[in-house]
């Protein structure tokens, strides 16, 4: 089989502040569009109003409500309140700089600190594009918070491998593949079976014994992917972002009633209304307070996941992209603005003979890295 050709980044969804989303004009892009500098980009981090791109040469470029550029960058993490930048130092240390988003890369940063990596060689040896490791710091003993204090230490025994932040909660994946969550829980996004908040990282007991490979935090929902390719999802389902039946889409005529089993027993909040073909009430799930197993169409195995504010994107082992949830700005990539409460494959990449390798969601948009499929 021939080697894969160099890939490129694509974007779709909300771009009302002029952030780079390919060739689209106006406030939104409904279908994947190549980014102008997509070949050189290796990391993408998107907030609501701007996006940070890091190139393979270490150049950081901002697009949208925040603008500017800087060199010697290893990683960047964008949020509405601040921009965190990891810059290469003269030795093994890296320099972490935190800027207010409105004055990013201009003047002095709000805060800066030297960071010593825990181990060398943590980046992908093949140089494959990734969404980046921030907000977890290279030392794996602390992370960056969008609210002061910006530097948040982690207990050493957590042995963090990945950390993701939602609007009010945090998810941590440790070296053993176990998941911890903490923060606000009013939408069930912590996965502990209640709507209570947690001040400290708490092991997700429902997944204990299962080895997870990746976690993703949406605005108020959570996803994790196991090493065997299974997807577990929980939290708020207001726009169908959990791929479970939701009242909002049913009222818009954009969903169909489906049979659900043991919905009450698994702890989810179920609301029922009339309308099923057999006359029985149709089940709708508003909040799923602990992990539910989600099957993709055709039994596809997942390898990567990312969440927007109210939408979800998953990459399969065969390089296909599935999206669902809120689609008002085209962030699902299906050439329309329909919201979905079930996974749907993004046909653009199939039609173009592209294999998706990475996905990273902003609150209202989506960025995808894909390569041309190798030819036998």
UniProtKB/Swiss-Prot annotation:
Q: What does this protein do?
A: Plays a role in transcriptional repression of satellite repeats, possibly by regulating H3K36 methylation levels in centromeric regions together with KDM8. Possibly together with KDM8, is involved in proper mitotic spindle organization and chromosome segregation. Plays a role in regulating alpha-tubulin deacetylation and cytoskeletal microtubule stability, thereby promoting cell migration and TGF-beta-induced epithelial to mesenchymal transition (EMT), potentially through the inhibition of KDM8.
What is a single cellular component term in the Gene Ontology annotation? chromosome
How is the quaternary structure described? Found in a complex with KDM8. Interacts (via N-terminus) with KDM8 (via N-terminus).
Gene Ontology annotations of biological process type: chromatin organization
SUPFAM superfamilies membership: RCC1/BLIP-II (SSF50985)
State the protein's name.
RCC1 domain-containing protein 1
| Organism name | Homo sapiens
PROSITE patterns referenced in this protein's UniProt entry, alphabetically:
RCC1_2, RCC1_3
Q: Where is this region: Interaction with KDM8?
A: 1-169
**Residues where (3R)-3-hydroxyarginine occurs?**
141
């Amino acid at each position: 089989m021939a080697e894969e050709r160099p890939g490129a980044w694509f974007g779709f969804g909300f771009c009302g502040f002029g952030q780079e989303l390919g060739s689209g004009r106006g406030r939104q892009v409904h279908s994947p569009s190549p980014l102008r500098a997509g070949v050189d980009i290796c990391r993408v981090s998107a907030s609501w109003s701007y996006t940070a791109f890091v190139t393979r040469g270490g150049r950081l470029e901002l697009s949208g409500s925040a603008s500017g550029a800087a060199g010697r960058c290893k990683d960047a993490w964008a949020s509405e309140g601040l921009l965190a930048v990891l810059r290469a130092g003269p030795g093994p240390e890296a320099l972490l700089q935190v800027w207010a988003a409105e004055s990013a890369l201009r003047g002095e940063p709000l805060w800066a600190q030297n960071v010593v990596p825990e181990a060398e060689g943590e980046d992908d040896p093949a140089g494959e594009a990734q969404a980046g490791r921030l907000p977890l710091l290279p030392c794996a003993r602390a992370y960056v918070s969008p609210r002061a204090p910006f530097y948040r230490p982690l207990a050493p025994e957590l042995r963090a491998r990945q950390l993701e932040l939602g609007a009010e909660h945090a998810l941590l994946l440790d070296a053993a593949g176990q998941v911890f969550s903490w923060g606000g829980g009013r939408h069930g996004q912590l996965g502990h079976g209640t709507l209570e908040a947690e001040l400290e990282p708490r092991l997700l007991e429902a997944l204990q014994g299962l080895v997870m490979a990746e976690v993703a935090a949406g605005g108020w929902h959570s996803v994790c992917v196991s090493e065997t390719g299974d997807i577990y999802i929980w939290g708020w389902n207001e726009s169908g972002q959990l791929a479970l039946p939701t009242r909002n889409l049913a009222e818009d005529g954009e969903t169909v009633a489906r049979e659900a089993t043991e919905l009450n027993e698994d702890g989810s909040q179920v609301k029922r209304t009339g309308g099923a073909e057999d006359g029985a009430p149709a089940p709708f799930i508003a909040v799923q307070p602990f992990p539910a197993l989600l099957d993709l169409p055709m039994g596809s195995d997942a390898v990567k996941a990312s969440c927007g504010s109210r939408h979800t994107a998953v990459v399969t082992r065969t390089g296909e992209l599935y999206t669902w949830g809120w689609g008002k700005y085209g962030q699902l990539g299906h050439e329309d603005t329909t919201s979905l409460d079930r996974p749907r494959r993004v046909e653009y990449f199939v039609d173009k003979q592209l294999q998706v390798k990475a996905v990273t969601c902003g609150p209202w948009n989506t960025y995808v890295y894909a390569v041309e499929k190798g030819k036998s």
